[in-house]
Amino acid sequence: MSSLWIAIAAVSAIALVSGLILGFAARRFQVEADPIVERIDALLPQSQCGQCGYPGCRPYAEAVANGEKINRCAPGGEAVMRNIAALLAVDPQPLEGDGVQSEPQRQVALIDEANCIGCTKCIQSCPVDAIVGATRALHTVISDQCTGCGLCLPPCPTSCIQLVPVPTTTATWKWNLQTIPVHILEVERHV
């Protein structure tokens, strides 16, 4: 029984010394992050879609801090580009594309449920948890949460997911309520 206690004490001592060495090394060799990268990253929509050409919002924020174009974030659109321009004190640029400033047409993922095998690979790859389902069960996309990033397309083994444009209807139209005059009508109440 005493050899058991000796082994426990030896392993505990090794763990304690290793922890102290790692703690010292972490403080000694700590790399300070660039605060401008943190601020740019906070402005980005965090959809991790990769439409800017970078694997996520953080790498794109680092690239913008190093001089990359500020107009590549499609999900953020013009509002994010203008906020980044104000932060960096540079002129706003037209959104990436045909040189014309336009809002990209919103797309959402659509799953062909007849071909879905329920592998959950699309659920694991969705950065905003817009796909719901269970193993070996049908999956579906919550279109209000889907950013249209397309990260769910490559892992699908049956290619049953496609991006479809969202038609502009009264339900999907971006209403600017500040331009609509609102008048409050008095209503008589009968008791």
Curated annotation (Swiss-Prot):
Q: Which residues form the 4Fe-4S domain?
A: 32-90
4Fe-4S ferredoxin-type domain: residues covered:
107-136, 137-166
Give the binding site residues for [4Fe-4S] cluster 2: 116, 119, 122, 156
Instruction: Return the EC number.
Output: 7.-.-.-
GO BP: electron transport chain
Gene Ontology cellular component list: plasma membrane
GO MF assignments:
4 iron, 4 sulfur cluster binding; electron transfer activity; metal ion binding
Sorted alphabetically, the keyword list is: 4Fe-4S, Cell inner membrane, Cell membrane, Electron transport, Iron, Iron-sulfur, Membrane, Metal-binding, Repeat, Translocase, Transport
Could you name the domain of life of the organism this protein comes from?
Bacteria
Which co-factors does it depend on? [4Fe-4S] cluster
Protein residues bound to [4Fe-4S] cluster 3: 126, 146, 149, 152
**Record note on cofactor:** Binds 3 [4Fe-4S] clusters.
Residues reported in the UniProt entry to bind [4Fe-4S] cluster 1: 49, 52, 57, 73
Q: What does this protein do?
A: Part of a membrane-bound complex that couples electron transfer with translocation of ions across the membrane.
Subunit details for this protein? The complex is composed of six subunits: RnfA, RnfB, RnfC, RnfD, RnfE and RnfG.
Q: Which family does it belong to?
A: Belongs to the 4Fe4S bacterial-type ferredoxin family. RnfB subfamily.
Q: Which NCBIfam families match?
A: PRK05113.1, rnfB
Q: What is this protein called?
A: Ion-translocating oxidoreductase complex subunit B
Organism in which the protein naturally occurs: Edwardsiella ictaluri (strain 93-146)
The organism's taxonomy opens as:
Bacteria, Pseudomonadati, Pseudomonadota, Gammaproteobacteria, Enterobacterales
